[in-house]
C-alpha cells in the first residue's frame, strides 16, 4: 500500500491552455525536452514545417500547423525539491487543441487533469480562447499556473499584463519571476521567492547564461549596467503592490503563480516545470453519482475522456483514453466495463509519447492509459474492479453549426455511416439522424471540425462526402417521459432526431421556433449540454 501511495504522490497530470499562436506547442516541446522525453526540440513553423512538433501527429494537423486532437505524453522528471532533496516526478502532459474550433475536445481533456498551465502571449495579452478555456477550468476550480511567453519580443509591460489577467479573468496573480527588460533589451528574470537572478542567453544551453545570488550583488551592476538599478526599483514596487503566493488560494483556483520567459529560446521553461512539480497537486479525488473516489483507494477505477480513431492509419483501430482515478492498473487485469455490464481483460493497454506507443505493464492514479477497442467503448464509460460507478462531469455541448452529409458515390453509404458513427463516438463531431428522413446531419461547435471530418472520411474510410448547409439554429437534448417525447414527435417530428447514443434531440430551425416549442411543451426539458453517461 505504501508504494501505491508514494507512486500516486509523485504524479502530476496537467494540460496547457492558450489562444492559438501564443506558443503552446513550442512550450509543450520544450517541456518534453527539459524532461528528457525528446532529443531535439523541433520548432513548429505553422504550415511550412518540415520537422513537425512531436505532439501534432495527425496528417491534417501537419498540413495546417494546428493541434486538432489532444495528445498525451508521459515522462519522468528529476529535480531538487524546495527542501533540497532529489525528487523524481512522473509528468503526464495533455496537449489540447489551441484552435478555437476544437473547444469540445479541449473541454473534455480538461476533465482529466489536476492542474493547467495557461500560456499568455506578452504581445497580445489575454485573448478570446484563453477566456473560454479558463472558464472551463473554473467549473472544477482547477489550479492554474501562468506562463507569460515571448519576452524576447517587444510586448506589453508586465504590470499591464498582470492587471489584465486579474481584471478580465478574475483571478489573482502572484508573480514568481519578474522580467528584466523585454524585446532586444530582455536580459533575464529575477526569482522573487529565492532572490536569484537568472540571466538570458539565446545561444546558451537551455537559454540561460548564469544565475546570480541576490539583487544587491555588484556583479549584477557589472553585467546589466543601468538596468540593475531599474530592476531593484521595480522589484520593490512589485513586492509592495502584488499578491504574495498563497498555496491554498492556488489549489482552490483563486490565484495563479506567474512565470515569465521565452519558450522558443528555452528560457523560463525549467522554472515552470519545477514549479509545476513543486506546487501542483498530485491526483485529486473524483466525484461519481454515488460517492467520492479517492486516488489512494487500492482498487482500480478510471473513466474514458476521449476516443481517437485511427491513431495509426496502418492499424484501423480506435484508442479509448482512460484517466486512472484510483488504485493501480496491471497488464492483463480483468475490469468491469460498467455501461456494457461485461468484465474484460485489458491485455494491451498503452502509454503515450505522442506517436510512440508503449505497452503498459502498470499505471497509477493520475496516469492516462490507452485501451484499444473496436467500437464497444464510448466517451464517459467507466472501468472498475467490480463496483458499478459512474463518474460525473464529462459533457457534450449543443453544436452551433450543422451540415447535411451527401455522397458523390451512393454505393458508399455504408462506409459513410460507419465513418461518421466512429468519428461521432470519438467526439470529432456529433451525428444526428432526423426521424422524418434518411439524412445524416452533423453538428459541431466550430466550422473547422467539418473540414477535419471530410478529410478523415476521405483518407481513413475512402469516402468522398460533401457537406451541405442544413437549416438548423441549435440543438437541444430532450428530457421527459417517453409519452411526453412522443407527444412532441406527433406535433413536430420533422425537427426531432436521434443522436449517436440513440437519445432524442430537438433540432430547432430558429431560436424563435425553439422558444415557442418550449412554451408549447413545458413538461419537457430542452437541455443545452448533456452529460455523457
From Swiss-Prot:
SUPFAM superfamilies: EF-G C-terminal domain-like, P-loop containing nucleoside triphosphate hydrolases, Translation proteins. One of its GO terms (biological process) is regulation of translational termination. It is found in: Cytoplasm. The keyword Cytoplasm applies. Residues 9-284 form the tr-type G domain. Its main location: cytoplasm. One of its GO terms (cellular component) is cytosol. Keywords: Cytoplasm, GTP-binding, Nucleotide-binding, Protein biosynthesis. InterPro entries: EF-G-like_DII (IPR053905), EFG_III/V (IPR035647), G_TR_CS (IPR031157), P-loop_NTPase (IPR027417), PrfC (IPR004548), RF3_C (IPR032090), RF3_dom_3_sf (IPR038467), RF3_GTP-bd (IPR041732). Belongs to the TRAFAC class translation factor GTPase superfamily. Classic translation factor GTPase family. PrfC subfamily. Increases the formation of ribosomal termination complexes and stimulates activities of RF-1 and RF-2. It binds guanine nucleotides and has strong preference for UGA stop codons. It may interact directly with the ribosome. The stimulation of RF-1 and RF-2 is significantly reduced by GTP and GDP, but not by GMP. This is Peptide chain release factor 3.
Amino acid at each position: 500500500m505504501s508504494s501505491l501511495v508514494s507512486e500516486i504522490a509523485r504524479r502530476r497530470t496537467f494540460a496547457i491552455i492558450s489562444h492559438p499562436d501564443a506558443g503552446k506547442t513550442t512550450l509543450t516541446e520544450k517541456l518534453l525536452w527539459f524532461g528528457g522525453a525528446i532529443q531535439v526540440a523541433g520548432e513548429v513553423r505553422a504550415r511550412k514545417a518540415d520537422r513537425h512538433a512531436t505532439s501534432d501527429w495527425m496528417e491534417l494537423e501537419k498540413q495546417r500547423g494546428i493541434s486538432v486532437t489532444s495528445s498525451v505524453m508521459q515522462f519522468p522528471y528529476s529535480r531538487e525539491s524546495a527542501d533540497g532533496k532529489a525528487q523524481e516526478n512522473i509528468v503526464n502532459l495533455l496537449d489540447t487543441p489551441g484552435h478555437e474550433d476544437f473547444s469540445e475536445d479541449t473541454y473534455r481533456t480538461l476533465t482529466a487533469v489536476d492542474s493547467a498551465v495557461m500560456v499568455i502571449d506578452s504581445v497580445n495579452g489575454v485573448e478570446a480562447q484563453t477566456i473560454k478555456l479558463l472558464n472551463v477550468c473554473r467549473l472544477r476550480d482547477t489550479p492554474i499556473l501562468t506562463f507569460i511567453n515571448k519576452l524576447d519580443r517587444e510586448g506589453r509591460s508586465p504590470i499591464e499584463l498582470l492587471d489584465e489577467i486579474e481584471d478580465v479573468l478574475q483571478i489573482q496573480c502572484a508573480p514568481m519571476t519578474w522580467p528584466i527588460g523585454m524585446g532586444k533589451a530582455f536580459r533575464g528574470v529575477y526569482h522573487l521567492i529565492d532572490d536569484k537572478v537568472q540571466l538570458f542567453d539565446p545561444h546558451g544551453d537551455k537559454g540561460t547564461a548564469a544565475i546570480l545570488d541576490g539583487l544587491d550583488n555588484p556583479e549584477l551592476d557589472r553585467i546589466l549596467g543601468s538596468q540593475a538599478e531599474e530592476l531593484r526599483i521595480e522589484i520593490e514596487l512589485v513586492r509592495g503592490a502584488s499578491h504574495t503566493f498563497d498555496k491554498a488560494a492556488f489549489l482552490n483556483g483563486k490565484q495563479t503563480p506567474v512565470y515569465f520567459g521565452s519558450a522558443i529560446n528555452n528560457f523560463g521553461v525549467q522554472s515552470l516545470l519545477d514549479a509545476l512539480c513543486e506546487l501542483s497537486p498530485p491526483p485529486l479525488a473524483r466525484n461519481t453519482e454515488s460517492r467520492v473516489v479517492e486516488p489512494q483507494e487500492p482498487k482500480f477505477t478510471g473513466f474514458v475522456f476521449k476516443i481517437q480513431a485511427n491513431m495509426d492509419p496502418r492499424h484501423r483501430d480506435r484508442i479509448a483514453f482512460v484517466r486512472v482515478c484510483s488504485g493501480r492498473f496491471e497488464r492483463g487485469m480483468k475490469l468491469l466495463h460498467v455501461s456494457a455490464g461485461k468484465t474484460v481483460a485489458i491485455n494491451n493497454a498503452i502509454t503515450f509519447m505522442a506517436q510512440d506507443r508503449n505497452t503498459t505493464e502498470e499505471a497509477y492514479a493520475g496516469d492516462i492509459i490507452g485501451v484499444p477497442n473496436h467500437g464497444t467503448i464510448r466517451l464517459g464509460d467507466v472501468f472498475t474492479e467490480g463496483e458499478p460507478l459512474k463518474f460525473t462531469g464529462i459533457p457534450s455541448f449543443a453544436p452551433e453549426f450543422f451540415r447535411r452529409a451527401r455522397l458523390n458515390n451512393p454505393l458508399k453509404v455504408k462506409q459513410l455511416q460507419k465513418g461518421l458513427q466512429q468519428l461521432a463516438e470519438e467526439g470529432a463531431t456529433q451525428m444526428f439522424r432526423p426521424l422524418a428522413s434518411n439524412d445524416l446531419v452533423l453538428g459541431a461547435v466550430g466550422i473547422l471540425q467539418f473540414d477535419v471530418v471530410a478529410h478523415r472520411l476521405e483518407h481513413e474510410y475512402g469516402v468522398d462526402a460533401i457537406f451541405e448547409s442544413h437549416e438548423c439554429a441549435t440543438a437541444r437534448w430532450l428530457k421527459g417521459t417517453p409519452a411526453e417525447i412522443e407527444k412532441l414527435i406527433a406535433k413536430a417530428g420533422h425537427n426531432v432526431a436521434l443522436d449517436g447514443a440513440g437519445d432524442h434531440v430537438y433540432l430547432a430551425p430558429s431560436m424563435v421556433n425553439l422558444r415557442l416549442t418550449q412554451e408549447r411543451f413545458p413538461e419537457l426539458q430542452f437541455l443545452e449540454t448533456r452529460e455523457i453517461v
